[in-house]
Curated annotation (Swiss-Prot):
This is Large ribosomal subunit protein uL24. Gene3D superfamilies: 2.30.30.30. Disulfide bonds: none annotated. Belongs to the universal ribosomal protein uL24 family. The gene is rplX. One of two assembly initiator proteins, it binds directly to the 5'-end of the 23S rRNA, where it nucleates assembly of the 50S subunit. One of the proteins that surrounds the polypeptide exit tunnel on the outside of the subunit. One of its GO terms (molecular function) is rRNA binding. InterPro entries: KOW (IPR005824), Rib_uL2_dom2 (IPR014722), Ribosomal_uL24 (IPR003256), Ribosomal_uL24_CS (IPR005825), Ribosomal_uL24_KOW (IPR041988), Translation_prot_SH3-like_sf (IPR008991). One of its GO terms (cellular component) is ribosome. Part of the 50S ribosomal subunit. NCBIfam families: rplX_bact. Keywords: Ribonucleoprotein, Ribosomal protein, RNA-binding, rRNA-binding. One of its GO terms (biological process) is translation. It comes from Cellvibrio japonicus (strain Ueda107) (Pseudomonas fluorescens subsp. cellulosa). SUPFAM superfamilies: Translation proteins SH3-like domain (SSF50104).
Length: 105
């Protein structure tokens, strides 16, 4: 089970976008994430009329390493760490380390 999953709200703790918040769009291999509105790059897109893609300079999100983000805790309104807890019924859930509340998935 991963500590950061798709649709989690994260806050950037290192890099040029430090302090910005965004939602995880995709989790890639090698502990990399694509977060909406974070780590924006300009890609020079070649036109492809067969696919209906116009050419030009397109702005899109690039991957960011998971160590540079932390999950956002809405209760404390701060970055937080994530741990795991096994409930009585045997389910494993993610919990915030600061207050022990379950992470909303």
């Amino acid at each position: 089970m991963r500590k950061i999953k798709r649709d989690d709200e994260v806050i950037v703790i290192a890099g040029r976008d430090k302090g910005k918040r965004g939602k995880v769009v995709r989790v890639l291999a090698e502990d990399r994430l694509i977060v909406s509105g974070i780590n924006m790059i300009k890609k020079h897109q070649k036109p492809n009329p067969q696919l209906g893609v116009a050419g030009g300079i397109v702005e899109k999100e690039a991957a960011i390493h998971a160590s540079n983000v932390a999950i956002y805790n809405p209760a404390t309104k701060k970055a937080d760490r994530v741990g795991f807890k096994i409930l009585e019924n045997g389910n494993k859930v993610r919990v915030f380390k600061s207050n022990g509340e379950a992470v909303e998935a």
